[in-house]
């Protein structure tokens, strides 16, 4: 009964939040008050010398007029500090347009959204469709540890399922951008977690406890602290999957996730031969990198080993789900095979 109430509350909350966010000015106010990246860039803009304040004001006015929403993303993308033509500036799509207008165009008539944004539902969908993914061995609901069948069990019982040195990831089921993820958690040695209470989880969130994946050596050399995944953008036309682009997402030193919101960088992968672009980029804060800033790994001339085989396995994975029009898959290359970690709509 409680679970049904929580699911109903969660659905209602998301529905209300989605409706409220459609108001451009509420959306803008929320970002200005809560988005740390926006706030940092706003401070930089006030002392910017790349352009005059008058030029910045005029560009923001044109940006807002063109996209019909406040020019918050002009600030967040750091466009005040980039010497670009107005045409190029207008190519930067505002978040409000993407999540409201474009998202509705892509998914407005999709009625089966099961697994759309919930990591536990996605895991069950992957199991149903025969898609390899890191194993979920437990759930945590309202700070209660449960087996995947819903039966409560103890911390000691969980420890008995985990080998010495094995890493676990504890993720909110509806999280994003790497927020609130507890990564590289060990129950026996190293970065050891001695008790359930020491995790300091948020009681209102539901978490999956997932086995960590050991990535292949060539990916590990780029950055060993994170699982570096292939963000694979897929367009579905007449239920046939077409890969639009692939980016290798790479974490930074000491950070256990590769999300851009946690400082990660991305480098484009050539679809034909698996070679990397000469430079990696960073969504949050901008910048270009010819090598990984922590490990010194040089991108130019490097490639993903056995690319034809890897690409064929990716194509097999993405063909097994065709409910949506566009998906951003997160694909990991393990020591023994290729795995789907999760997917993101749009």
Predicted regions and their residues:
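Active-site nucleotide/adenylate-binding loops and adjacent lid/helix of ATP-dependent enzymes
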Residues: 113-230
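A short beta-strand motif that forms the metal-chelation/ATP-contact edge
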Residues: 331, 335-346
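Protein kinase-like catalytic core scaffold
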Residues: 168, 242-244, 339-341
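Intrinsically disordered, low-structural-confidence terminal and linker regions
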Residues: 1-34
């Amino acid at each position: 009964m409680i679970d049904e109430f929580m699911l109903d509350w969660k659905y209602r909350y998301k529905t209300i939040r989605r409706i409220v966010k459609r108001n451009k000015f509420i959306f803008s106010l929320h970002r200005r008050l809560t988005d740390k990246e926006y706030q940092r860039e706003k401070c930089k803009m006030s002392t910017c010398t790349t352009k005059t304040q008058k030029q910045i004001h005029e560009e923001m006015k044109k940006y807002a007029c063109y996209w019909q929403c406040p020019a918050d993303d002009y600030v967040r993308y750091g466009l005040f500090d980039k010497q670009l033509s107005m045409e190029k500036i207008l190519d930067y799509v505002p978040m409000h347009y993407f999540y409201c207008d474009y998202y509705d165009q892509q998914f407005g008539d999709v009625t089966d959204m099961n697994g759309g944004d919930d990591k536990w539902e996605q895991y069950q969908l992957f199991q149903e469709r025969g898609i390899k993914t890191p194993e979920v061995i437990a759930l945590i609901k309202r700070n209660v540890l449960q087996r995947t069948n819903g039966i409560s069990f103890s911390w000691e019982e969980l420890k008995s399922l985990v080998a010495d040195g094995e890493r676990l990831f504890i993720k909110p089921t509806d999280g994003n951008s790497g927020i609130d993820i507890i990564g590289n958690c060990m129950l026996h040695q190293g970065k050891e977690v001695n008790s359930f209470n020491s995790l300091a989880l948020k009681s209102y969130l539901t978490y999956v406890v997932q086995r960590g994946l050991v990535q292949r050596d060539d990916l590990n050399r780029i950055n060993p602290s994170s699982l570096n995944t292939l963000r694979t953008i897929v367009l579905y036309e007449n239920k046939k999957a077409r890969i639009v682009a692939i980016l290798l997402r790479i974490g930074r030193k000491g950070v256990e996730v590769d999300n851009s919101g946690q400082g990660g960088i991305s480098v484009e992968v050539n679809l034909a031969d698996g070679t990397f672009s000469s430079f990696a980029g960073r969504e949050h804060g901008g910048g270009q990198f010819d090598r990984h800033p922590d490990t010194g790994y040089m991108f130019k001339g490097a490639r993903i080993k056995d690319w034809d085989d890897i690409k064929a396995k990716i194509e097999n994975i993405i063909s097994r789900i065709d409910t949506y029009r566009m998906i951003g898959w997160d694909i990991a290359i393990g020591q023994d095979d290729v795995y789907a970690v999760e997917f993101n709509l749009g």
